[in-house]
Amino acid sequence: MISIKFSKTIPKGLILFCFFSGIVNFTMAQEMIPLWPDGKMPNSKGLHLPDSIAKGFLFSTTSPRIYAFPAAKENNTGAAVLIVPGGGYLRLPSDYSKNATALFYQSKGINAFVLCHRLPDSKDLIHPEKAPLQDAQRAMRIIRANASRWSIDPDRVGVAGTSAGGHVASTLGTHQEDVSTIGDSLDQYSFKPTFMILVSGVISFKEAIVHKGSRDRLIGSNPSTEMVRNYSNENQVTKETPTTLLIHGDNDKTVPSLNSLVFYQALHAAGVPASIHIFPYGGHGYTVNKNPGTATMWPSIAMEWLKEMKMIPE
């Protein structure tokens, strides 16, 4: 029996957590879950570097993890969502304890898990462009491996990403290559999300509509044509791509709304059920509250869409 200490407290209890290649007994009074066992993290040089934090943001980590926000027993829908915050592949939030998006989904009976993934400029990485996807795949496997513990239906586990987090999320949903196997018991679980919710999402690395900062940080300032094509996720859509909801502001000056449009066109061409909502105002990075005008409706639209897609009950 392995014992793991976690850093954040939430109310009540003990549960058994099937983790790595064995069984871990941990206290549900803790909510931070590391993604990889010691010495088994792929794409790592083996450096153990402290988190780099400044002005409320995390700029580097060699300890990728998820933060769990389980739904209350009385309103648990059985659905789950992996939330990927934005930050241009430069930074992530440093405090996950009050993540508004996670708390919103949790309040609706959806089990929420917030991903803190490795960032491409980490000195520990061998292939920087692979790390966010590796961590996202592993997170999905952890959620499904422990579905019974959180009363989750493994067939209703999706991903939600904002801005560059939308690129991580859409990469997770479209790229077929398994880049996260490490030879433990979690490898057997699917990393593919059942649905995607992409808000102000970076999708394409094509010059005309690219968010240059995200592209340069992930694949370099002078990437090959092949690399640009591979990480322009509209090119990776197939009929197997998960059903998707796209939300964007038409006046987004950071990530052009054409990112969502080209992804919708690819989904439509492949016959994937998809919905797109482009609101006139609100700029970049809608939140679950305090959006202007009609954009204030997007969280309600997301809930109705999840019902329509049979991900949560009516």
Can you describe what each PLM-predicted range is?
Residues P93-S94, N99-T101, H117-P154, P292-T296:
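Catalytic nucleophile-loop/oxyanion-hole region of alpha/beta-hydrolase
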Residues Q30-N75:
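N-terminal cap/lid segment of alpha/beta-hydrolase-fold proteins
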Residues T77-G86:
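Short beta-strand element of the alpha/beta-hydrolase
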Residues R138-V210, V228:
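Primarily recognizes the serine-hydrolase "nucleophile elbow" in alpha/beta-hydrolase
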Residues L246-H248, D252:
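Short beta-strand/loop motif that positions the catalytic acidic residue
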Residues I53, G201-Q236, P242:
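Mobile cap/lid helix-loop segments that gate and shape the active-site cleft of serine hydrolases
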Residues L261-E314:
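C-terminal catalytic histidine-bearing segment of alpha/beta-hydrolase fold enzymes
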Residues K253-N259:
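Conserved alpha/beta-hydrolase "acid-adjacent" motif
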